[in-house]
């Protein structure tokens, strides 16, 4: 019947590995290009890696693409990535291990442009984000007992941001600011 047309052969034979892997290291991410194995039933290529904060990530690319983009890296350093070819029977190849060394996440560049200005009942902030990455600015204020209280969270992907934190007492206060990205990478903290 017609249903036979849609049945596929299930096997237990692992596909071959990808080959000729090329690494393009960028800010907070890596693009890998490779030669796909000659497999009739190739489903996808999957990359597995562990971020600096211990989070395990997995990214996949279809059998019709010879590249995969890996995101979420914080500080630039060496990481190991395992690439697997996966067939339509969900058999995995042996891992093809690649060493990558992405540059620091763009949040660190944004952090270095942060400027603070006193404002009545608050503080004005200015920063530059030329790559228009999604960033989160966290702002804290020191309480009278010496503890730090979170007072504001600002989400932005603007190339140039001018923001203000208002509604605070019009008296001198100590502030602290940091940036994080959507992968929970954090910059150092700037104290004012």
Describe these PLM feature segments.
Residues 28-40, 121-133:
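Conserved aromatic anchor
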Residues 1, 70-96, 161-191:
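Beta-strand-rich modules
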Residues 7-16, 98-107:
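Proline/serine/threonine-rich low-complexity linkers at boundaries of modular beta-sandwich domains
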Residues 103-120, 192:
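Low-complexity, Pro/Ser/Thr- and charge-rich linker/hinge segments at domain boundaries
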Residues 17-21, 111-113:
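Surface-exposed, proline-enriched loop/turn segments that connect beta strands in immunoglobulin-like
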Residues 42-76, 140-170:
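Recognizes extended acidic, P/S/T-rich segments that occur
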Residues 123, 130-181, 185-191:
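Solenoidal tandem-repeat scaffolds enriched in leucines and small polar residues
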Residues 2-6:
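Short, small-residue-biased leader/transition segments that mark boundaries at the very start
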């Amino acid at each position: 019947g017609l249903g036979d047309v849609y049945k596929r052969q299930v096997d237990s034979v692992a596909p071959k590995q990808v080959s000729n892997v090329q690494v393009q290291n960028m800010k907070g991410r890596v693009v890998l290009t490779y030669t796909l194995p000659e497999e009739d039933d190739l489903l996808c290529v999957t990359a597995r890696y562990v971020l600096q904060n211990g989070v395990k990530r997995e990214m996949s690319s279809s059998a019709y693409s010879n590249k995969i983009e890996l995101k979420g890296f914080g500080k630039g350093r060496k990481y190991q990535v395992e690439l697997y070819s996966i067939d339509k029977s969900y058999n995995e190849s042996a891992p093809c291990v690649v060493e990558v060394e992405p540059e620091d996440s763009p949040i660190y560049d944004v952090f270095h442009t942060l400027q603070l200005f006193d404002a009545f009942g608050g503080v004005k902030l200015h920063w530059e984000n030329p790559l228009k990455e999604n960033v989160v600015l966290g702002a804290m204020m020191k309480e009278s007992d010496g503890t730090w209280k979170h007072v504001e969270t600002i989400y932005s992907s603007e190339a140039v941001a001018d923001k203000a934190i208002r509604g605070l007492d019009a008296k001198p206060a100590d502030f602290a600011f940091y940036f994080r990205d959507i992968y929970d990478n954090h910059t150092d903290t700037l104290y004012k």
